């Protein structure tokens, strides 16, 4: 009788334990489900935010060396055009705000980026023997500087940022067979001094200063805020965003070709030049369209 009674008590205790554990388990399951759903919602929100940011300010792409197709073109950017104005203003520093030339000039002056010679053929070379010394740049283009204790100093009003109203850029349009996508990447930039214009209609003469390797300066350009346009005065983009998103408006003046010719070498009139530029632009667009059939 005592054994039966003991067995009955143990059985009842076991049943009570199971019954009491069920709500806790259900609460735990419900809590985990809510947490998982919340995590998914947060992940979705984060992903949406990431996608939106990627659309507005895409991450700089690295161009593979083994692309299936590539066309290199050189463009001239006229900073008096509205599309290119963010590169020019402010002409003189306002507080911490500076324009692109002042920024890269200071980087070159302090040895943070290298400047490379602009050769007569206009083709960039980023070899070690093509690097320019800072004094060479300053002396060649009559930029006033002072030297003290081995350090070169240039006052803000001696930086010729107002005269740099043009840039040459090299861009590569390429097909990446691994991703099946077309992309356009700026690979080199050259600031151009425009000097010699007069009040009698004389045109300014371009003086290309030096080439900059875009991959070398890109990390610095990502720290230079600028206004996207005249209609939005918020500094909501960087110089790197500007070039990565191809926000500039530039006319083709040269392509990579076997003869090394610029368009001016075989286009004798302005109309012939415009026609050739249009042909090259269409050639690039047609290739992309033909690839996708």
Where are these regions (language model features)?
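A domain-level signal for the mature, folded cores of soluble proteins
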Residues: 23-178, 196, 216-293
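Residue-level detector of short, conserved catalytic/binding motifs and their immediate flanks
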Residues: 165-167, 171, 185-191, 210
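Residues embedded in well-ordered secondary-structure elements
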Residues: 10, 158, 178-180, 201
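Bacterial Sec-dependent N-terminal signal peptides
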Residues: 1-29
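Extended serine/threonine-enriched, polar tracts that run as long, contiguous segments within proteins
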Residues: 181, 186-206
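Surface-exposed flexible segments
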Residues: 201-218
């Amino acid at each position: 009788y005592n054994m039966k009674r003991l067995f009955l008590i143990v059985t009842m205790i076991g049943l009570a334990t199971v019954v009491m554990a069920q709500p806790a388990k259900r609460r735990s399951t419900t809590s985990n489900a809510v947490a998982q759903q919340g995590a998914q919602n947060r992940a979705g929100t984060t992903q949406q935010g990431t996608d939106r940011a990627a659309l507005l300010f895409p991450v700089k792409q690295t161009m593979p060396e083994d692309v299936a197709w590539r066309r290199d073109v050189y463009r001239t950017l006229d900073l008096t055009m509205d599309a290119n104005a963010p590169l020019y203003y402010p002409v003189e520093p306002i507080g911490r705000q500076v324009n692109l030339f002042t920024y890269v000039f200071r980087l070159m002056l302090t040895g943070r980026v290298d400047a490379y010679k602009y050769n007569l053929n206009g083709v960039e070379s980023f070899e070690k023997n093509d690097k320019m010394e800072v004094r060479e740049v300053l002396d060649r283009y009559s930029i006033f500087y002072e030297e003290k204790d081995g350090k070169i100093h240039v006052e803000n009003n001696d930086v010729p940022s107002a005269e740099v109203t043009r840039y040459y850029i090299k861009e590569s349009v390429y097909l990446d067979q691994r991703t099946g996508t077309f992309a356009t990447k700026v690979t080199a930039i050259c600031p151009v001094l425009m000097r010699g214009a007069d009040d009698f209609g004389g045109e300014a003469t371009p003086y290309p200063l030096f080439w900059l390797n875009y991959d070398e300066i890109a990390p610095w350009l990502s720290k230079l805020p600028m206004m996207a346009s005249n209609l939005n005065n918020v500094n909501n983009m960087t110089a790197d965003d500007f070039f990565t998103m191809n926000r500039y408006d530039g006319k083709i003046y040269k392509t990579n070709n076997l003869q090394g010719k610029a368009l001016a070498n075989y286009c004798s009139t302005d109309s012939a030049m415009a026609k050739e530029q249009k042909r090259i632009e269409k050639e690039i667009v047609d290739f992309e369209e033909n690839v996708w059939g």
